[in-house]
């Protein structure tokens, strides 16, 4: 049984998406979910997925972007999941 809500969520999405399972197996760490460019609700200030990727790459991380699933395992097409790994 998962020890935390985050671990339970990661287990759920890894079971749904082989790309996410592969990233976890390769040692990638989940960072955050972020809106895709032009997908944030009007008037909301938020960093986009591309902004997160750029900042992490500047910090020296290998970065991957995948689909996002909610807590019920449903795809969220306006969001991207950001993953990082130190090379």
Task: Indicate residue ranges for each PLM-predicted region.
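N-terminal cationic amphipathic segment used for targeting or macromolecule association
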Residues: 3-6, 32, 57, 63-65, ...
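C-terminal edge-of-domain segments
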Residues: 62-87
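An N-terminal amphipathic alpha-helical segment
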Residues: 1-42
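Short, hydrophobic/π-rich interface segment
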Residues: 35-71
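Small/flexible residues
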Residues: 18, 49, 57, 78, ...
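Generic N-terminal initiation segments characterized by hydrophobic and/or small/turn-forming residues
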Residues: 7-9, 20-21, 53, 72, ...
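Intrinsically disordered, low-complexity sequence elements enriched in Ser/Thr/Gly/Pro
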Residues: 14, 45, 53, 74, ...
